[in-house]
């Protein structure tokens, strides 16, 4: 399999041999030596030297490579020169001139626009072995310059390449490898550029001596780095499933199977996007986070507002980095919470049109990407999402008020973690009736409060033991009296009603209540409702 470095050499050579004298390479700053090494290989193919310059060097640098890249001053001074490209082209030097940083202010610099255009035509007319490569970490070429300045992208290494790097590093540092260690390290390093992987591995081997702790070091580095760019790698939730969501479970199981190699053999592919929509506090975010665990992929959470930078260039660099990260992370879930907030004013030119450009980039990626990534977004208000965005979601699930059977499952999950209890069927009926209309989040909070109260009681009485405390129904009922469910508050209930009125646009996360706690559908004036021939349940 061809490495990214070999591909860069081949792509640039193709441009050079097709008489394209001017090009750009988009690469991470940390990968400079890798880019120069690839161009040195390309230069050897066509027998031309490589030169490099950025504003930190007074003179143009001659590039050579033996064991590593080395730079040496030439006689050509470029610092403090307004038009460095024209200065280069006025010399007698021949070769490949790699200029870094010139495109940083490209969008707002009319003189630079003209200089690049002039450089293209000068190179084209002279018919000499001279090439200019403009290097930047985020390149956005305007339409008029697009045919003059083709862009080659030097992307992070593939998982196969990272595996080879990891194995070589473990061997060099005299550590034995095993499949689990290799898998965890590759997962933690995925999405990083070559140069950054090398730095992280060097730091890891110098600071961590215990093999089992090595993946954690790499992952901690990655988390800290991404945090400043609006990206997080959340820890796995402390529960295995979201209760009472049988229909959503079926969808997630389908998606899991569509990520299997057998699906590709049949020409099937996983969905590109799933939308979880509905009432606040119903478990949308938790369901999205658990989906990564269910599918067996990496969870990458993004905060849209934090992706917006101080400039269009910074903002586009952030979203490009995010999409490159998930595309190179193997099986992955890209998670956006409260996604509708990202599109407030997106088409109105707010913030210089940056929101529109970012949204356009995401829309294009959702449509075109072929990597094993599913985007899962949660929203409260469907009407705040643009129609062209809604169309990109292949599955839309609605989270509404949960029925008695689902509420019973929610209680079971939280009670089993915190208490010993033995409720009779009648006691369960009483509990579910008291908490009817509460969201899963409100149930979880109530159980947590009761667990805290029992802990405080036992500590103060001197009767504390590490065993789970015995729970009585009356304590949970008393806790219910201390709060008003959101669904009962006028302002919030109106918002919930508005959300539920649009629920027909999506598939509910739970099907009909088939539990023993299902509420009997009471007939009107003795006339059964249509479809009421289903099994009669015990009334709550």
Give, region by region, the residue ranges found by the protein language model:
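C-terminal engagement/docking regions of AAA+ P-loop ATPases
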Residues: 2, 6-15, 229-290, 324-328, ...
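Walker A/P-loop NTP-binding motif of AAA+ ATPase domains
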Residues: 22-30, 39-142, 146-151, 161-166, ...
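AAA+ ATPase "lid" subdomain C-terminal helix
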Residues: 189-215, 433-489
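Conserved ASCE P-loop NTPase core motifs with emphasis on AAA+ ATPases
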Residues: 210-241, 340
